């Protein structure tokens, strides 16, 4: 009971959520460039982009969620499936709204999988076992289903909760594709196929340590503000918000009731420890220059190196997302009896920089060149160009700033 009270009264500073959201914001600040090739005019594609999972999420929103949860868990699995239909033609399928859709599974729902090396040396997913949970209304038992995929068939079973979880076969259908329509999306590749490495695993441990120290602070504040009253059992008294500690009757009769109150000097040490852990989290996430809420002593070189590391981290994540999305679109086209010949291009450079620091440097260069003997216009032109690069949001705006269109009156 006491542990539950401490959990309920302790705030949680969710650094994992903050960092995952920051990564997501940088990765999808500019939308990926998607060339769908031969399937770009298919009506199924337009419907899929507007509602990827048949629950209203657009494809961009779906991929953002995929990136968020792969950042947390290390990997997720995206399944591209198509509902069963008795339609005989493609026109009938379109009329019924039958098309491929996407579904995301986090690691706790991926029960088993197997990769096998083909004759060409490529590893191929040959078996997959997934757990699906169907939430029911209040007062009704939740239903659990198991879906198993092989290259030849797809099996669906219901978990019998009355018989120690024994699966009850429900249906078995032929796998029309001849392969398993699933793609593992990694945050970072690990040594084992199908298991990724989380971006925030160490950060989560540090955040838990911070939460424990916040709990200690809360307890110290509570005990300091509400001291305990020490009395014998016969004394009839109350201690307000504080506790009452009863002494045995055998104690010295000369003892009078007194207050027991701990010192609060250790709170400052705990707060300093929390601050040090937050700085460590920023270093681990390469965000010391982005998440700091106070001025920290960092040289210009250290700041630039921090941004380079963050840019490299985001670039690696972008490559993994691009590779996964290309594989997903191949499965989508295969469900429609086509071959994906398009191209997916995620941004690989994120141009993370401290504009204030860069402007200070350019200002010093301009002032120095102005006082130098024999200063030429070329130096000033370079400074002006760099200032335009800082002010422009993208390459198109930079081009317009460097090549302004003059009006007829100005010509």
Regions found by a protein language model. Give the residues of each.
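Extended, helix-rich architectural segments
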Residues: 1-105, 409-411
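Alpha-helix boundary/N-cap detector
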Residues: 3-18, 22, 36, 40-43, ...
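Short secondary-structure junctions and interdomain/linker hinges
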Residues: 26, 34, 55-63, 69-77, ...
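Short amphipathic alpha-helical segments
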Residues: 44, 54-58, 62, 70, ...
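Extended, regular secondary-structure scaffolds
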Residues: 67-190
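Residues in well-ordered beta-strands of folded domains
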Residues: 79, 129-131, 246, 345-347, ...
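Extended, charged amphipathic alpha-helical segments
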Residues: 165-305
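C-terminal helix-loop subdomains that flank or include functional centers
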Residues: 250, 269, 276-411
């Amino acid at each position: 009971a006491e542990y539950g009270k401490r959990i309920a009264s302790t705030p949680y500073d969710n650094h994992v959520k903050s960092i995952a959201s920051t990564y997501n914001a940088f990765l999808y600040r500019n939308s990926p460039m998607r060339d769908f090739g031969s399937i770009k005019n298919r009506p199924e594609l337009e419907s899929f982009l507007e509602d990827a999972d048949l629950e209203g999420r657009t494809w961009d929103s779906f991929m953002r969620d995929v990136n968020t949860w792969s950042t947390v868990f290390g990997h997720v699995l995206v399944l591209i499936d198509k509902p069963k239909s008795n339609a005989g033609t493609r026109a009938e399928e379109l009329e019924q709204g039958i098309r491929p859709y996407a579904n995301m599974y986090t690691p706790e729902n991926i029960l088993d999988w197997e990769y096998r090396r083909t004759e060409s040396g490529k590893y191929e997913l040959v078996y997959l076992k997934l757990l699906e949970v169907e939430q029911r209304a209040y007062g009704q038992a939740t239903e659990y289903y198991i879906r198993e995929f092989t290259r030849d068939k797809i099996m669906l079973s219901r978990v019998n909760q009355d018989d120690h979880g024994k699966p009850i076969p429900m249906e078995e259908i032929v796998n029309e594709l001849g392969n398993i329509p699933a793609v593992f999306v990694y945050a970072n590749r690990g040594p084992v196929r199908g298991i990724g490495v989380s971006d925030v695993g160490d950060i989560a441990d540090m955040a838990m340590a911070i939460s424990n120290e916040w709990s200690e602070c809360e307890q110290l504040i509570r005990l300091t503000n509400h001291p305990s009253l020490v009395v014998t059992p016969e004394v009839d008294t109350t201690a307000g918000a504080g506790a009452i500690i009863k002494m045995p009757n055998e104690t010295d009769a000369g003892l009078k009731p007194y207050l027991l109150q701990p010192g609060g000097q250790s709170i400052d040490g705990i707060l300093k420890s929390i601050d040090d852990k937050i700085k460590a989290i920023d270093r681990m996430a390469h965000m010391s220059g982005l998440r700091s809420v106070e001025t920290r002593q960092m040289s210009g070189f250290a700041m630039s190196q921090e941004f380079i590391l963050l840019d490299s981290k985001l670039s690696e994540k972008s490559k993994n997302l691009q590779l996964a999305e290309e594989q997903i679109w191949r499965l989508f086209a295969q469900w429609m009896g086509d071959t994906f010949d398009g191209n997916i291009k995620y941004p690989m450079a994120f141009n993370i920089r401290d504009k204030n620091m860069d402007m200070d440097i350019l200002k010093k260069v301009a002032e120095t060149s102005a006082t130098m003997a024999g200063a030429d216009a070329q130096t000033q032109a370079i400074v002006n160009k760099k200032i335009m690069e800082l002010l422009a949001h993208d390459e198109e705006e930079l081009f317009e700033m460097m090549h302004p269109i003059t009006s007829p009156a100005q010509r």
